[in-house]
Amino acid sequence: MFKRKSTAELAAQMAKLAGNKGGFSSEDKGEWKLKLDNAGNGQAVIRFLPSKNDEQAPFAILVNHGFKKNGKWYIETCSSTHGDYDSCPVCQYISKNDLYNTDNKEYSLVKRKTSYWANILVVKDPAAPENEGKVFKYRFGKKIWDKINAMIAVDVEMGETPVDVTCPWEGANFVLKVKQVSGFSNYDESKFLNQSAIPNIDDESFQKELFEQMVDLSEMTSKDKFKSFEELSTKFSQVMGTAAMGGAAATAAKKADKVADDLDAFNVDDFNTKTEDDFMSSSSGSSSSADDTDLDDLLNDL
């Protein structure tokens, strides 16, 4: 069942997890999401639970790429979840084309996105009271991740005490508050309450009930859940088209599209003055994609 553990042990586990950068995950069975009102606001009280496996951290970090281009979606888990940037065609595309420095718009579209996962006990859920007392998986973003870290990475020399918020006895409930600010969900007012034990946690039958509802988060990042580089490359090429070629090939493709656009822009009189030979080698048509909303909007946000 549950065991007490030191905050130093949790801090070390979280530091190891923090080495991974990037993604989001699609809808997951058993995931709890805060229901928002028509104004985009909502609140609940949850409790982060310890790991189901004593050797694993109580959190999981999953890195993904999710974007739409040329009318097609690319939504795949990224191998950088395990610190491997070479087995992801999107990461290679970003690196080879130096998108961070040369094309900020493209970089923002295809960059890695990170989702954090935990087992939680729903303490209070005003919008869905039927969830109260139940255990779910919960996906959250960096804002909440930073608040969890702030409870552990304290200044001991200044008299601050680190808190393992996942401890069933000495952890703390988390008040999740979401407010709509400038069209985005804002989590700034979310906070941890004072340390407290989960009610009835000393009852072994209650512990067992909670434990059996929890999932092994390490399975989410198991390498056998990730697609091969070849499979991902095929999908990436289908979505990106000529842009996936990168380098000189992509540049040539862009120039060809530019020529086609220029030809389309000729007026009829100019066209009539040209001979058939002038246009024998011309190509027509070009592809473009409009800006799309972030995939997190498609997945109803974090």
From Swiss-Prot:
InterPro entries associated with the record: NA-bd_OB-fold, Phage_T4_Gp32_ssDNA-bd, Phage_T4_Gp32_ssDNA-bd_sf, SSB_T4
Subunit structure as annotated in this protein's UniProt entry: Homodimer in the absence of DNA, monomer when binding DNA. Interacts with the DNA helicase assembly protein; a ternary complex between the helicase assembly protein, the single-stranded DNA-binding protein and ssDNA is an obligatory intermediate in the helicase loading mechanism. Part of the replicase complex that includes the DNA polymerase, the polymerase clamp, the clamp loader complex, the single-stranded DNA binding protein, the primase, the DnaB-like SF4 replicative helicase and the helicase assembly factor. Interacts (via C-terminus) with the viral SF1 dDA helicase.
Region listing for LAST, in residue ranges: 3-7
Region (Disordered): 273-302
Acidic residues composition-biased segments: 291-302
Residues annotated to bind Zn(2+): 65, 78, 88, 91
GO-annotated molecular function: metal ion binding; single-stranded DNA binding
Gene designation per UniProt: 32
Keyword flag Zinc: yes
Gene3D superfamilies: Replication Fork Single-Stranded Dna Binding Protein (3.90.198.10)
Free-text comment on this protein's domains from its UniProt entry: The acidic C-terminus is involved in modulating the ssDNA binding properties. The N-terminus LAST motif is involved in the cooperative binding of the protein to ssDNA.
Entry keyword set: DNA damage, DNA repair, DNA replication, DNA-binding, Metal-binding, Repressor, Viral DNA replication, Zinc
Biological function: Single-stranded DNA-binding protein that participates in viral DNA replication, recombination, and repair. Coats the lagging-strand ssDNA as the replication fork advances. Stimulates the activities of viral DNA polymerase and DnaB-like SF4 replicative helicase, probably via its interaction with the helicase assembly factor. Together with DnaB-like SF4 replicative helicase and the helicase assembly factor, promotes pairing of two homologous DNA molecules containing complementary single-stranded regions and mediates homologous DNA strand exchange. Also promotes the formation of joint molecules.
Low complexity: bias regions: 280-290
Family membership: Belongs to the Tequatrovirus single-stranded DNA-binding protein family.
Top-level taxon in the UniProt lineage: Viruses
Name of the molecule in the record: Single-stranded DNA-binding protein
GO term, biological process aspect, one: bidirectional double-stranded viral DNA replication
